[in-house]
């Protein structure tokens, strides 16, 4: 795995190749600034496969650098590990929103950093073996592109959408919040009804368009709330929100649905693309180990799926007073 490490501290730039070598990675290049890193990436004939970025650098910090790197097509999915002594939620949120894959704290825990590098290598290998055309670009309308969508189970990654990350990055985000002692997040899932029928009928572009419409509706419903979101396949989205906790998802669900209904989405031929969604009640994440984070994601999806089944048996009224924090 070819690694580029970026830090304005010469000592760190000497240390990182030694740590990487202990983890089995000998191909490490270094850059002393964001500008120098971008020059190296631009002029490198062989793409780097992992990037280590210090957040606290002068002129161009690591978060801004991460944003610039993600704008380079060949680096949209490259694992990016942020390096920093900063543990405030603001920096963690901004780093993952900019496209970070993982986060390592300074002063370095050597074992932890080796683990981060090995996980980045696993992710890089997995992505290389699962390349597919449906995630190469972001369709802007259902009239662009054709063909058959990827399998319904596939966690299609739609590029270029703010706060949308892959599931691995979402897991790492929650783990970093836990390591920094920052609580207060809650998780809920949104599920598209009859996703099998939409998937069976839609082209690649139409299916991506449908997924994007829901992402946009969720984002608008959340408003100014800080959040990260991941599409995990089968028409399900996981949302990690740092806003005020709500006991019931009914009002959130109604807001998302209203936004979708106002879009009047269509297939290529002008037929209506009717999208109905259900949202599960939120829950607190258990971030002690990765397995428990996965279990939390599964529980969130199960709640959304249970809501889908509940609505099949008839609507229930929205209780606005209980939707935001009044104990049941």
Residue ranges and their predicted role:
Residues 180-200, 235:
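Catalytic-site or vestigial catalytic-site microsegments of nucleotide-handling domains
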Residues 10-30:
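Two-component/phosphorelay signaling modules centered on CheY-like receiver
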Residues 215-245, 265-268:
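Conserved helix-loop-beta segment at the catalytic/binding core of cyclic-nucleotide signaling proteins
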